[in-house]
C-alpha cells in the first residue's frame, strides 16, 4: 500500500441491510448488543385507517359521569333510510356504491348503531331524496332554485 493515492484506492465494503432486514427482531437485538442507539416506534392504528373518524371529544366523554355513550342514529332515521332505499329499488350495497361508502355503513345507519355523521347523512339524503336531519325527517327534499 506504499504506492496508494486517493485515485487508485479500492474500497471493499459490505452492502448495508435492506429496510426489511433492519427492522427485523434479529437485527434490532444485534444492534443493541453492539451498543448502538436503537429507536423503535409503533404506528398507531395503522391497520384501522377509516374514512370517517369519530370527531366527538372522547376526553369530554371520559370526564362525564352520567351517561357514558355517544348519541346514535335514531331508529326513525334508520327506518326512513330503509323505506327510501326500497322505494328507489336499491339494495344496501347499491346505495353504498352510489354514495361511495361501505355497505356496512348503510347497515349501521339503518339499524341505529351508527354515530351520526353529517357528511354521510347528507349523501344518503341526496341519494334517496328524503330528509334525515332536522324536524321534517322523512319528508321529500324540495329542489328549489340554486343561488349562484
Swiss-Prot record:
The modification N6-methyllysine is found at residue 25. One of its GO terms (biological process) is positive regulation of DNA-templated transcription. The keyword Zinc does not apply. The keyword Transcription applies. Residues 33-42 have a biased composition (Basic and acidic residues). Changing residue 87 to D: Loss of interaction with CALM and higher affinity for TBP. Same effect. SUPFAM superfamilies: lambda repressor-like DNA-binding domains. GO terms for molecular function: calmodulin binding; DNA binding; RNA binding; TFIID-class transcription factor complex binding; transcription coactivator activity. The modification N-acetylalanine is found at residue 2. The modification Phosphoserine is found at residue 4. Its main location: cytoplasm. Induction: Down-regulated by HIV-1 Tat or phorbol ester (TPA) treatment in endothelial cells (at mRNA and protein levels). Keywords: Acetylation, Activator, Calmodulin-binding, Cytoplasm, Developmental protein, Differentiation, DNA-binding, Methylation, Nucleus, Phosphoprotein, Transcription, Transcription regulation. Expressed in brain, liver, lung, kidney and heart (at protein level). Ubiquitously expressed. More abundant in heart, pancreas, liver, intestine and adipose tissues. Residues 81-135 form the HTH cro/C1-type domain. It is found in: Cytoplasm; Nucleus. Residues 92-111 bind DNA. Residues 69-108 are annotated as: Interaction with TBP and NR5A1. GO terms for cellular component: cytoplasm; cytosol; nucleolus; nucleoplasm; nucleus. Pfam families: HTH_3, MBF1. A motif (IQ motif) lies at residues 81-88. PANTHER family: ENDOTHELIAL DIFFERENTIATION-RELATED FACTOR 1, ENDOTHELIAL DIFFERENTIATION-RELATED FACTOR 1 MULTIPROTEIN BRIDGING FACTOR 1. Transcriptional coactivator stimulating NR5A1 and ligand-dependent NR1H3/LXRA and PPARG transcriptional activities. Enhances the DNA-binding activity of ATF1, ATF2, CREB1 and NR5A1. Regulates nitric oxid synthase activity probably by sequestering calmodulin in the cytoplasm. May function in endothelial cells differentiation, hormone-induced cardiomyocytes hypertrophy and lipid metabolism. Interacts with TBP and the transcription factor IID (TFIID) complex, NR5A2, NR1H3 and PPARG. Interaction with TBP is regulated by phosphorylation. Binds NR5A1, ATF1, FOS and JUN via their conserved basic region. Binding to calmodulin is regulated by calcium and phosphorylation of the IQ motif. The IQ motif, which is involved in calmodulin binding, overlaps with the binding domain for nuclear receptors and transcription factors. Its phosphorylation probably allows a switch between the two activities of the protein. This is Endothelial differentiation-related factor 1.
Amino acid at each position: 500500500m506504499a504506492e496508494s493515492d486517493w485515485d487508485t484506492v479500492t474500497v471493499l465494503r459490505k452492502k448495508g441491510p435492506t429496510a426489511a432486514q433492519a427492522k427485523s427482531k434479529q437485527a434490532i437485538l444485534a444492534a443493541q448488543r453492539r451498543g448502538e442507539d436503537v429507536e423503535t416506534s409503533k404506528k398507531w392504528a395503522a391497520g384501522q385507517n377509516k374514512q370517517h373518524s369519530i370527531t366527538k371529544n372522547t376526553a369530554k366523554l371520559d370526564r362525564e359521569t352520567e351517561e357514558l355513550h355517544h348519541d346514535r342514529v335514531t331508529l326513525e332515521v334508520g327506518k326512513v333510510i330503509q323505506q327510501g332505499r326500497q322505494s328507489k329499488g336499491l339494495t344496501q350495497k347499491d346505495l353504498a356504491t352510489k354514495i361511495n361508502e361501505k355497505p356496512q355503513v348503510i347497515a349501521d345507519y339503518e339499524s341505529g348503531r351508527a354515530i351520526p355523521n353529517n357528511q354521510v347523512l347528507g349523501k344518503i339524503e341526496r341519494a334517496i331524496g328524503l330528509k334525515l336531519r332536522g324536524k321534517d325527517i322523512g319528508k321529500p327534499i324540495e329542489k328549489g332554485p340554486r343561488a349562484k
